[in-house]
Amino acid sequence: MSGETVHGISCYSVVANTEDTYNQTLDFYQKLGFKKVASFGTSDSDNARVCNESLREDWMHVAGNNSAESVTIKFRLVPGELSLSPAAEDSEWRGQKSSLVFYYPNLLDLLKQLSADAIKYQAFPNEKKPDEVYVEDPLGNLIGFSDRYNPFAHANLKKSEESGAASNLESGLATPVVETLKKATTSDKPAGVKKKIAVMTSGGDSPGMNAVVRAVARIAIHRGCDAFAIYEGYEGLVQGGDMIKQLQWGDVRGWLAEGGTLIGTARCMAFRERPGRLRAAKNLISAGIDSIIVCGGDGSLTGADIFRSDWPGLVKELEDTKAITPEQAKLYRHLTIVGLVGSIDNDMSSTDVTIGAFSSLHRICEAVDSISSTAISHSRAFIVEVMGRHCGWLAVLAALATGADFVFIPERPAEVGKWQDELCNSLSSVRKLGKRKSIVIVAEGAIDSELNHISPEDIKNLLVERLHLDTRVTTLGHVQRGGIPCAYDRMLATLQGVDAVDAVLASTPDTPSPMIAINGNKINRKPLMEAVKLTHEVADAIEKKQFAHAMELRDPEFADYLHTWEGTTFIEDESHFVPKDERMRVAIIHVGAPAGGMNSATRAAVRYCLNRGHTPLAIDNGFSGFLRHDSIHELSWIDVDEWCIRGGSEIGTNRDTPDLDMGFTAFKFQQHKIDALIIIGGFEAFTALSQLESARVNYPSFRIPMAIIPATISNNVPGTEFSLGCDTCLNAVMEYCDTIKQSASASRRRVFVCEVQGGRSGYIATVGGLITGASAIYTPEDGISLDMLRKDIDHLKATFALEAGRNRAGQLILRNECASKVYTTEVIGNIISEEAHKRFSARTAVPGHVQQGGNPTPMDRARAARLAMRAIRFFETCRANDLGNDPSSAVVIGIRGTGVSFSSVADVENNETEIEMRRPKNAWWRDMHNLVNILAGKTFAD
């Protein structure tokens, strides 16, 4: 050979044959200070610098003072390649294998770090004054460290310092490994050493816990941290070892659709004692973990905060007993705790709802809906016991959603000696109207006003003896914990899991342990122990018979739902009637496409009208039915009895608006003496109300209180954050996508492009993508471009290459029906198939009107009843104050945060609406789009 000589090292490459060893190797070199600078997959096979056989490549670099002193290592994942045998421990490693030797000026610091990470090493000539140190990386490659920058030098760094030659070398000439480990003695974390965040589930399991673990793991990795799972709750924390495992990106694939907790939960008496917590602290420090995200109930979160308060003393004791080194004690002197509330009872104060509560409510309503058919068949009474030792949330919401006849809860106990008569009178009165079934919901903690327990058997015996009813008791028990998480719990768990990681990274030693809560539809952080204290106050208030205070400690929605159930359940009591001159004829009309909750709202409006002395009128088949066929009739109590559980529209609906014939519409209003109008529907209903309000100037019969209750699966009505039917639609889309994703996973290498409805609003596509784990979503707000498709296809190529045919490897793309006129669902599917080059396949799926759902979800039923009752109250206020012609008497009744809002339709139309696009100007859910991309691994892969 002749010519130019070698000037330096361009790069060094290592090859792994399994993904586990590949990831372990990346982690090993990152601890040494190497930074990832490039990532490649099979889609980059045309890049000459990438090995054609590589399924994955990551290039890592460490910078020196100039390019010749820098080091680049190419890591390659090539299945089937032979692995190196480990060196014999009883011999000198550097004589058995070739080695790559890095310069490092302070080998004593290095030995301390290797010991802390439990990495085996050999030091020469000895550990007290080493000149060279050797370790094996996870692939079996021998890596050396020397404090001689020049291998031909006879003097090491310490001797060179005497001659002034060390000033440049100590700054890290060849590698930032020097700076990385040298800073360990002056900061909480060595530079280049990742923060390690552990997640654990504790206490009773609840649906949505797996979504928490998935979100925490992926967001932690995305934020540059290492994610760990602590298996079997506090028991795993005390045992340590294999109970604490690192989570890789792919380990949590498919977890969104799983119920319970896949990392386990168990009771642990040992953790309640200091010796148990001491072992737990040792296990965490050994694993390098100083942050824990705990998902559980108030007991689990209390235990976590006690652990944090004990931490400094535990670390000192471990240091004093030499169980850990002084360096470890300094490095892990603080513990960060973040709490997430996983509880089906929804019994935690300071948050509107807990993870798992709505899924449990789904199970209860499914059971009661099923029981109803057999109860009607045999004219039976059923006593259904639900969970809730100190909280009646499940019982109240279940009673409201299923139309139960009576409910017993701990916060509002039945009056001792009187509840028996109240129950019997209530059930017998509806039986006289022709009702064939009786449903009584009982919380397991139900009591009377003297704190005597009320059991289902007590109620059964009463009904049998007094009313001679064929009565059965059904205890749902752990059925309430089972099943897949519902759409809301998946969304809530994901959003709170994301914020929990951010809370860890923002935490300081002086910050109180936060609890991630949701208040007013926003994720918030609350002081953990304050929330626990308020939760315990509820039980204390009940014990002290301070029942009003116990109700005050619950969230405002709870009391509102209880009042709604009372107002729509008990038979007309004339003592609650308004004065005769204030009684109204209230018309109810459905406008637009069917949506879950329309019938529930109608039922609640009818029953509350009757309870207040008003006359409810149903307009059949929308405005066209009203104008062409004079389709209007009164509704009675029993007419709407089963409507709360029915989907669709019992009185018929279409998209016609009153501008078909505004004058004739006004005549019909006058003819039937309509005093108030409830319009239940979507954007067409919003348009109809706007038209009627604008026509008041010409038609006096429209000068009455009017309101729209938004009901559309698209959730595109301005003036509210949620429309009735959107939760039912999300659950229908979720179940559909879970099914096709299962098919895609079975085929291993398949992606489904699923078209969802929503009009020009991307709500269903965006939130649907979040709760189903979609790889990509396309919405009208963002449109579709060729570059967008190219990036998503490249991402799919890389994903399928990395998954290498493993289970749960199916991919999903959600496309809104109006996202693009050019890039249709079929076109996108064909483009993906063509670009895949048979590495994977693409199929399209269009659920169509299946998305409207069957029976409405409990959330839509409860919201519908609440809004309908508030509408009647609003009409009464307008009537009493003679506001019929005031713009404020034509309103959109919506949900903003946890409260019910009344917004003038004129103001909403002028300030909050994109009329041409038929959607609100500001959508609270838009930020979720970026989160979908992150959790799909796009930003991570980049």
Curated annotation (Swiss-Prot):
GO molecular function per UniProt: 6-phosphofructokinase activity; ATP binding; fructose-6-phosphate binding; metal ion binding
Pathway in which this enzyme or protein is active: Carbohydrate degradation; glycolysis; D-glyceraldehyde 3-phosphate and glycerone phosphate from D-glucose: step 3/4
Keyword Cytoplasm: yes
Binding-site residues, ATP: 204, 267-268, 297-300
Entry comment on modification after translation: The N-terminus is blocked.
Active site: 345 (proton acceptor)
Disulfide bond residue pairs: none
Protein name, UniProt field: ATP-dependent 6-phosphofructokinase
Superkingdom, natural source: Eukaryota
Cofactor(s) required for function per UniProt: Mg(2+)
